[in-house]
A protein has these predicted regions:
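Conserved ABC ATPase signature
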Residues: 56-63
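Conserved ABC ATPase "signature" region
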Residues: 24, 36-52
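Hydrophobic anchor residue at the start of the ABC signature
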Residues: 70
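Catalytic Walker B motif of ABC-type/P-loop ATPase nucleotide-binding domains
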Residues: 81-85
Length: 227
């Protein structure tokens, strides 16, 4: 059987065939005798079991087409599935549907999935390992756990006079960025309590001060732009 499957860019569907017939044809292409049970299992898995069996792929929504494409890719039980931008153009429900299908394939069917995507917030919800690339070169390869543990904390400060506060913090070994309504401190030797003391000594009224973890998206851009 086909042990590697891929969906690159637009899925290759037979638009004049139903979902069932598309899957049946794919099994024939892989040299297998079409099995009704197997086709029904895949239709269930990708959420197309309740679609009108006469409905042709050309009349499917973008999300349905993408789910059928995944069905075609897994009908022959591959060990590795390669997906290129699998959620491009999908609405929030379509994105969640694809994410749920991929999680099932990974957890219940033990399929390794390699996803190339620019939508980092989505990768953050499903990936176990990352290969980060820039200009065609691999710049980092690591597990999600390792990357998460290395993500720095930043401190967010909001005061009555942010322009004055940033000068005081900068003079006290803080790397600061002034945002529209707050200050972001990304590197400092001070604790939050020490920052509060420094600002209060200088009669700065503090509205809020808290720690926030750098997001994976910020981590990625810092890594890529630092090169």
């Amino acid at each position: 059987g086909c042990k590697l499957s891929s969906i690159v860019e637009s899925p290759a569907l037979h638009l004049n065939l139903s979902a069932y017939d598309n899957l049946q044809y794919q099994l024939l292409l892989c040299g297998e005798t079409p099995s009704h049970e197997k086709i029904e299992e895949v239709l269930n898995l990708v959420g197309l079991a309740d679609v009108d069996p006469k409905k042709k792929a050309k009349d499917f929504s973008l999300g349905m087409r993408q789910r059928l494409a995944i069905g075609l890719a897994i009908i022959d039980s591959p060990k590795l599935l390669i997906l290129d931008e699998p959620i491009n153009g999908l609405d929030p429900k379509g994105i969640k549907d694809i994410r749920d299908i991929l999680a099932t394939l990974k957890n219940d069917f033990n399929i390794t999935i390699l996803i190339s995507s620019h939508i980092l917030s989505e990768l953050d919800l499903i990936a176990d390992d990352y290969v980060i690339m820039s200009k065609g070169k691999v710049i980092q390869e690591d597990s999600k756990l390792a990357i998460l543990s290395s993500l720095a904390n930043k401190i967010i400060v909001s005061t009555a006079t942010n322009h004055t506060a940033i000068e005081i913090l900068t003079a006290n070994n803080c790397d600061c960025t002034l945002l529209p309504d707050k200050i972001e401190v990304t590197n400092t030797t001070l604790t939050i309590n020490q920052m509060i003391d420094v600002l209060r000594k200088n009669q700065i009224e503090i509205f809020e001060i808290y720690k926030e973890q750098v997001s994976f998206e910020e981590y990625y851009f810092n890594l890529v732009e630092g090169r």
